[in-house]
């Protein structure tokens, strides 16, 4: 036999290759390319599709991140439902930006640079809690002559070292200027933070700093400041000090200041130590202010103690307050102007006429609210009703100091009180301000317009600002033809036209959104009703099913009882009953019952 040479089993033969080519040509003729059968080609296409899919997912993720970053810069308008750009926080300019001393402008930091904890740390580092009176005290002590050793002064001590006053003054002035520039820069940074813009922060030191033209003026300012800071401690002990100490104090202090400055300084110091306004000082504290020719800048201890006892022990009639300058709207401002014009460069909160002490606020609130029994709304109603210029109500009771018994008035005092009451009744009615520092009463009829403007929407405020003669409701709710006719009758500029179109567009969008929400709510309510109906029907069907199961179970029980009863009545040829394990009863469609054995051979017996 001839042996046939077979090709290796791993390689196809030439005949197989020809056959494969023939089959491929047939597939190509049928529209199938050869790449369909190429596994490597299909794998490359699969990898390419996978890369395209991953690239698409990456692009979608990038687009989502861009949209998220874009919407983070917008805020949702609850009124119209559209997104508006967030307005950056405006920088609050400092009150001392126009000062001649400090022309340095601090850079405005970003809103995220400083937080509350950083601000507190910055304040703690900038403002160390030490007594600033040490420098001024040392400066003043260097110019005060030596006090005898047998007099113990609680305020002044001997200078620790001998140094020329001019050198010390120049050093102190330079240090104070540097510190104040740093303080101004710190406050500029603090006021630019959005978290602290809601606070009405006022820097008294920066607002009340004046120029220092010469070392002599700086010396006067330092000494005057120390004199003011030591006045509250001297008030309690001025009656017990010896005349020798008072004379030494007056001589040393008046040698520095002129007569005009010392008299003006006395007025301001008494005004600030008593924490009252200049208007109240003219009425109640006239005995405290001494003339330069008589007291030489300092009140005597007898006058001081007598005036204090009269003021504290005497009754205060609230009807007299209506005659006071502080409660008079058209009182002259010459006294305040004189006090503001100071050459010593010291300001004791008298530059701002609207600033009042807490005592005045309490007194005015008691006088205007508690004793008269009026609230803000009641005062507005009284102002708005005609015929209320002159009213006679219950007499205002006098206020006595706590702990003192009420003493009966003498005949002269009663006559004077009656005269004052009649004068107050005949005087034209003037409204009581919130505090004596206010020039105008807050209870004016302008409140009604301001309250109405507070309830206006943003579109109404814009339309009012651009003087659009149509109401916003008319712009939104008019049909197209009526709206075009209304617009053709007026001439508008570009800003007004853009605002009108914007108002109408957003109003229509708002109405459409409301209608959409209304339809959705109606659909939700309808679905809830259908769901409740289906629940009721389900409960009803479950109840019927339970009843049917019960009746079916009862029928089966009755049927089994009947089956056993009929089966027990059957007998075989020998008169024996049939065994239920071997036979069973079956009923045909015509109603006949047969006894059928359970074996395969049916041995039927008809009854």
Curated annotation (Swiss-Prot):
The modification Phosphoserine is found at residues 40, 214. The keyword DNA-binding applies. Residues 593-598 are annotated as: Mediates interaction with CHD6 and is necessary to activate transcription. CDD domains: bZIP_NFE2-like. Glycans are attached at residues 464, 474, 489, 501, 571, 576. It comes from the Eukaryota. Residues 333-355, 581-591 have a biased composition (Polar residues). Residues 501-520 are annotated as: Basic motif. InterPro entries: bZIP, bZIP_Maf, bZIP_sf, NFE2-like, TF_DNA-bd_sf. A motif (DLG motif) lies at residues 29-31. The modification N6-acetyllysine is found at residues 598, 601. Residues 524-531 are annotated as: Leucine-zipper. Disulfide bonds: none annotated. One of its GO terms (molecular function) is DNA-binding transcription factor activity, RNA polymerase II-specific. Residues 499-562 form the bZIP domain. GO terms for biological process: cell redox homeostasis; cellular response to fluid shear stress; cellular response to oxidative stress; negative regulation of ferroptosis; positive regulation of transcription by RNA polymerase II; proteasomal ubiquitin-independent protein catabolic process; proteasome-mediated ubiquitin-dependent protein catabolic process; protein ubiquitination. This is Nuclear factor erythroid 2-related factor 2.
